[in-house]
Each structure stands twice: as structure tokens, then as C-alpha cells.
Amino acid sequence: MRRAVCPGSFDPIHNGHLEVIARAAGLFDEVIVAISTNYAKKYRFSLDERLEMARETLASLKGIVVEPVGEGLLAEYCRQRGVSAIVKGLRSSSDFDYELPMATMNRQLSGVETVFLPAEAHYIHLSSTLIKEVAGLGGNVSEYVPRSVLRRLLAGEPSANQQPRR
């Protein structure tokens, strides 16, 4: 079985993520959407909320598993799960410059390859951070996120992990 992992914090998951994951599902037998938590970052949504949103929005795709990645190296996670490839979406050359050293290190540590999928043109500008900022200021982000994510964004209840506004 060809198994890949699409890692990320997905805070929140958006249509750019979904497009890359759907394309990965066409390339691999199983794609693990591994949701990470970096304790140095502040999140709008808790890990449980991010897992729930991903599961809701990816339920119709075959061969997708959503799970928390836990602590530790992604390379070790890949080795434990029998993953042959890490799939990363690229929006720009700066994404590539950021991802290439990590891809090289992951290959050296575990032998796992990284597959880069360029984002579709209409998603190049999307980031979870931008979506949260625009939604927080009352902007319409409905064409960029699934309905279940939009509902949570509009609810306006911050997760316990969110950094307080000044």
C-alpha cells in the first residue's frame, strides 16, 4: 500500500488544503492528514476542533485518515506509520525555500520522500492566518472555507489556546 502524510496545523482547514489533499488521494492508496500542535504557537481552534473540522470536510474522500501527529519528529512518525511520502502544497517560491531543507532532513532521517504539489492559481493567496484575520474583521471568507469551518469562524468563540487580543 502506498501511504502518504499531509501534515499541518490546519487552523483552520481551508479549500487550498482540501484541493491538495484531494490530489494526493489520487496519487496514493491512503493519505493521512496529520494535524500537529506546536506548543510555541497560539491557535484559534483547539486540536479537537481542528480534527473534527478536517474529518467533517474530508468524509466524502476515499482513502483519507485524519489523526493527530503528536509530539516528536515527522520523520519518526512517518517511519512508525509506514509512510512513503510527505505531501506538501506549495503556493510560492518562498514556500519551497521553507520546505526544501525540511524535506531533505526528513529524507536523511527516515528515507521518506517529500512530494510537492503546486497550489491551484485561485488558492495561491490562501493561508489559515489570512482567513482568520479577514473573518475576524468581518470579511467574507465563505468561498475559501467549507461550511462547517465558516460556521465556527463566524461563531467567534475563541479556543482556550487563542492569544488574547490587545
From Swiss-Prot:
Pfam families the UniProt entry points to: CTP_transf_like (PF01467)
CDD domains (alphabetical): PPAT
Keyword Cytoplasm in annotation: yes
Binding-site residues for ATP, renumbered to this chain: S9, F10, H17, G89, L90, R91, E99, Y123, I124, H125, L126, S127, S128, T129
Top-level taxon of origin: Bacteria
List of residues binding substrate: S9, K41, L74, K88
Role according to the record: Reversibly transfers an adenylyl group from ATP to 4'-phosphopantetheine, yielding dephospho-CoA (dPCoA) and pyrophosphate.
Official protein name in the record: Phosphopantetheine adenylyltransferase
Species whose genome carries this gene: Pseudarthrobacter chlorophenolicus (strain ATCC 700700 / DSM 12829 / CIP 107037 / JCM 12360 / KCTC 9906 / NCIMB 13794 / A6) (Arthrobacter chlorophenolicus)
